[in-house]
Regions:
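Non-catalytic cap/lid and distal C-terminal segments of serine-dependent acyl enzymes
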Residues: 35-401
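Hydrophobic alpha-helical segments, principally membrane-spanning helices and signal/leader peptides
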Residues: 1, 22-24, 29, 174-175, ...
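Bacterial Sec-dependent N-terminal signal peptides
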Residues: 1-23
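N-terminal edge beta-strand
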Residues: 21-42
């Protein structure tokens, strides 16, 4: 009885607190973001004592930003205005196209998330809010009323790395109740990412669920590894505890991950009901993951029947002299070996303002000169998730057919 009384008091206090907050705004908390019928969007921020509030996000016109890695298209910035209640707001000047968007706010120069929007994603060490304007391709990124696959976090012993590591595995709807064997796509993230990236930022499970339900993609297993060979798992899920996510981890792009990858394939073939041959095995990745996909496939020319490079890093400018850097030697000969094995698809996608565009153009020219067949897709924009979701959506409709 005493416990019940305490619970009732606690609930009353919580309700009173919520009511007090709502009373400040006429009984209703501000909504942010608010997607209007015409697909303009209003963002709001409760900061009555702030002097300046801004918003930055990929729904705004881009601005050029120079970085050590090249020139990037950075999200634009817009100013919010304050009303008499201390609520700041900004409404887009035109309707937004269907897409999954991300944004953050800046209150007196400090970057913050939108406290009125609980939906966030992490990209390296940046946390952003997200919202979706539905319709068109964005409907692939939604959870729709279709059969859903299962997403598992799977630990495995990485003998090459000498540690236990984690991967994310998607199995299609019906996997658990059937005896059928399935093809496998190995889907790799970019630098600074991890085994969470394609699920959280790339909407991989939603894309697969929807395209499989529409009959546009074959049911498949999707394996999303952690491409940082020195890392057990994504930050917060390792024995190191709540570490700060960072770029430039040890052994990044020096061959160790590529050398270890055949063990991942063996593990998946042993643990899951797979069609264990090259015609039912695909690999693809974005940026560093495209780099990994290229060098894993050319060093194992009979392993993958489908190769996808999404805004891929192509060449390695500097070598550290490590024992595994032979992986990057003899590119021309290894490409010849790969195409001699007759892959069913070699797919390349990149944005026309991507800082890796020139490298990809030179690589495509090499393939053309050698007479190697490939499929190419060019989109607007730069080195961004908006493009990589498109590439994944296109690629999975072409493999295993």
């Amino acid at each position: 009885m005493k416990k019940l009384s305490i619970l009732v008091i606690a609930l009353c206090m919580a309700c009173g607190s919520a009511s007090a907050q709502q009373a400040l705004f006429g009984g209703q908390m501000p909504l942010s973001p608010e997607i209007h019928a015409d697909k303009t969007v209003t963002f709001r921020c409760m900061a009555p004592n702030a002097q300046k509030v801004q918003i930055t996000g990929d729904f705004l016109p881009t601005r050029k930003m120079d970085t050590p890695m090249g020139q990037f298209d950075a999200p634009g910035v817009a100013e919010l205005t304050k009303d008499e209640k201390g609520v700041w707001s900004y409404t887009t000047t035109s309707p937004l196209s269907p897409e999954l968007y991300s944004y953050t706010m800046m209150v007196d120069g400090a970057s913050v998330t939108d406290h009125l929007n609980v939906y966030t994603v992490r990209d390296i060490n940046n946390v952003s809010n997200i919202f979706l304007v539905d319709g068109g391709k964005a409907d692939l990124y939604k959870v729709n009323k279709v059969p859903h696959g299962t997403v598992s976090k799977v630990w495995y012993e990485d003998a090459k790395a000498g540690i236990t590591r984690r991967m994310t595995v998607y199995t299609p709807a019906g996997y658990e109740t059937s005896k059928e064997k399935y093809p496998v796509l190995y889907l790799l993230h970019g630098i600074g990412g991890d085994e969470e990236a394609w699920m959280d930022l790339g909407r991989a499970s939603q894309i697969l669920d929807n395209l499989i339900a529409q009959g546009k993609a074959k049911p498949m297993i999707v394996v999303m590894t952690n491409g940082n060979i020195s890392q057990e798992a994504a930050p917060g899920y390792t024995s190191e505890g709540f570490i700060v996510p960072t770029l430039g981890l040890p052994k990044t792009m020096e061959g160790s991950f590529e050398v270890s990858f055949p063990e991942v394939v063996k593990f998946i073939d042993a643990r899951y009901r797979t069609l264990a041959n090259s015609q039912n095995r695909a690999i693809a990745g974005l940026s560093m993951g495209g780099f990994h996909s290229l060098y894993i496939s050319i060093n194992n020319p009979k392993t993958f029947g489908y190769v996808g490079l999404f805004s891929a890093a192509i060449g390695k400018e500097q070598k550290s002299g490590g024992a595994n850097e032979y992986i990057y030697d003899n590119l021309d000969k290894k490409l010849a070996d790969l195409f001699a094995a007759k892959p069913k698809l070699f797919w390349i996608g990149i944005g026309n303002s991507d800082f890796l565009y020139k490298d990809n153009t030179a690589f495509r020219e090499k393939l053309t000169q050698k007479g190697y067949p490939f499929t190419y897709m060019e989109t607007d924009g730069g080195h961004i998730w908006r493009n990589w979701r498109i590439y994944l959506s296109e690629y999975v409709q072409k493999i295993f057919k």
